[in-house]
C-alpha cells in the first residue's frame, strides 16, 4: 500500500513539473495553429529578453488586403514592427527617433481593421 501511494505521489509530481513554466503563447480561443510559426518565433525571442515596458504584445489586423501582425514599440526610441504572415517586415508604423516610424505605411493606424490581440507578455517586470 505504501509503495502504491509513493508511486502515485511521484507520478503526480512528474506531471506537475513537466507542465511548470510552460505557457500557451496564444491567449486567443483559436489556438497556436492560428499564429504563423515565424510570429511564434518572434514571441519566443521576446520571452528570452527582459520584460518590456510597456509589456510586449502581438496583434493581428487586416491592412491593405492582407493579414498582418503588429508588434508595438517597446519604448521611446524603438520602432514598432508590422509583418506579413511570412514575417516579411512591411514597415515601422511608429516609434524610432522621430516617433513616426519609417514612414513606409503612414496610413496603418487609420486604415487597419479587425484588431485581435494574440499574445501579451504577462511576466512581472
Q: Which residue ranges define each predicted feature?
A:
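C-terminal partner/receptor-binding element of secreted or periplasmic proteins
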Residues: 95-125
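Short, non-transmembrane alpha-helical segments in secretory-pathway proteins
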Residues: 28-52
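Sec-dependent signal peptide recognition
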Residues: 2-10
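A short, polar/charged loop-to-alpha-helix boundary motif
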Residues: 79-83, 101-103
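C-terminal motif of bacterial Sec signal peptides marking the signal peptidase cleavage site
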Residues: 16-19
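Exposed beta-strand-loop-beta-strand "reactive/processing" segments of non-cytosolic proteins
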Residues: 56-75, 80-81
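Bacterial signal peptide processing site
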Residues: 21-23
Amino acid at each position: 500500500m505504501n509503495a502504491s501511494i509513493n508511486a502515485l505521489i511521484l507520478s503526480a509530481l512528474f506531471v506537475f513539473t513537466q507542465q511548470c513554466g510552460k505557457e500557451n503563447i496564444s491567449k486567443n480561443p483559436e489556438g497556436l495553429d492560428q499564429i504563423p510559426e515565424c510570429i511564434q518565433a518572434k514571441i519566443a525571442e521576446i520571452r528570452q529578453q527582459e520584460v518590456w515596458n510597456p509589456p510586449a504584445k502581438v496583434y493581428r489586423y487586416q491592412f491593405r488586403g492582407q493579414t498582418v501582425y503588429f508588434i508595438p514599440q517597446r519604448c521611446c526610441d524603438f520602432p514598432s514592427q508590422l509583418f506579413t504572415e511570412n514575417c516579411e517586415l512591411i514597415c515601422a508604423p511608429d516609434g524610432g527617433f522621430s516617433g513616426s516610424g519609417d514612414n513606409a505605411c503612414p496610413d496603418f493606424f487609420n486604415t487597419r481593421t479587425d484588431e485581435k490581440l494574440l499574445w501579451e507578455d504577462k511576466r512581472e517586470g
